Amino acid sequence: MKYVITENRLVNLIDNYLEDSVGRLRKFPLDHINAREDDFELSDDSGETIFTYFDYGLGVEEKLYVKMLSLFNLNHKELEKLLEKWFTKHYDGMVLSVYPIIE
């Protein structure tokens, strides 16, 4: 059975998923030589970096990125668009690109 879900509803689902799977995110200034004043990272309670906002790009922890692709059955472009909307909703920053953080 297929359902039609609005984009706003999907952003809310991503909101709930991140809250349930990652927990509360804490914002820290980005400690990088080329970081702008507005750049930062979002870490979970254990201190692991989940998102990095650097030079208008949003880096997403690789395992989380892959899980979200699979769980929501999205392609990369669709996930990038949703994460961009989620980020703008919560952190009011302009995102030009979204990418997995590969370590």
Each predicted region: which residue ranges?
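Intrinsically disordered, low-complexity segments enriched in Ser/Pro/Gly/Ala and basic residues
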Residues: 7, 20, 42-45
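Short acidic, low-complexity intrinsically disordered linear motifs used
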Residues: 1-18
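Short, surface-exposed recognition loops or helix-turn segments adjacent to catalytic cores
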Residues: 29-32, 100-102
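Acidic, low-complexity, intrinsically disordered interaction modules
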Residues: 32-89
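Short, charged/polar N-terminal "headpieces" of proteins
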Residues: 21-30
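Short acidic DE-rich linear segments
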Residues: 3-6, 97-103
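Positively charged interface segments
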Residues: 94
